[in-house]
């Protein structure tokens, strides 16, 4: 099984797979993680040492079974799962300063990177999670 996790954070995706009894050994089952926060990467490396860290999502692409990243190229064949939760600060209904940029905000526009890779990869399964948001952002996503 091949999993690509975007905005991986501390690898909550692997926690969920773990609870299902699925482990990533880096050989038969591979978990590729795109994350840029150093502390989150450190937590993942400690808890899931077989994770393949691929860096910044904006520098990831996929073509003909190859995953191209800032940390190298990987012959992966088909990707089974694309998972992730793009940054939400710009469109969350809980925005504290009451300024909402929607999906055009500096952080939340990374949603489009998820969408780009979803189209490139066409995985068997995908999961995009996020927060409760304003109606305008919901319309854009639909």
Residue ranges and their predicted role:
Residues 1-142:
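Conserved active-site and SAM-binding loop architecture
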């Amino acid at each position: 099984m091949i999993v690509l996790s975007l905005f991986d954070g501390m690898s909550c995706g692997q926690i969920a797979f773990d609870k299902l009894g699925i482990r990533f050994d880096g050989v038969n089952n591979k978990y590729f993680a795109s994350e840029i926060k150093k502390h989150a990467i450190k937590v993942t490396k400690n808890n899931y040492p077989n994770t393949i860290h691929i860096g910044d999502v904006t520098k990831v692409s996929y073509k003909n079974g190859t995953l191209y990243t800032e940390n190298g190229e990987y012959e992966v064949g088909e990707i089974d799962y694309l998972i992730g939760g793009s940054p939400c600060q710009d469109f969350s209904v809980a925005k504290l300063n009451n300024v909402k940029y929607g999906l055009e905000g500096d952080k939340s526009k990374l949603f489009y990177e998820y969408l780009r890779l979803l189209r490139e990869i066409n995985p068997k399964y995908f999961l995009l999670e996020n927060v409760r948001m304003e109606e305008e952002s919901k319309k854009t996503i639909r």
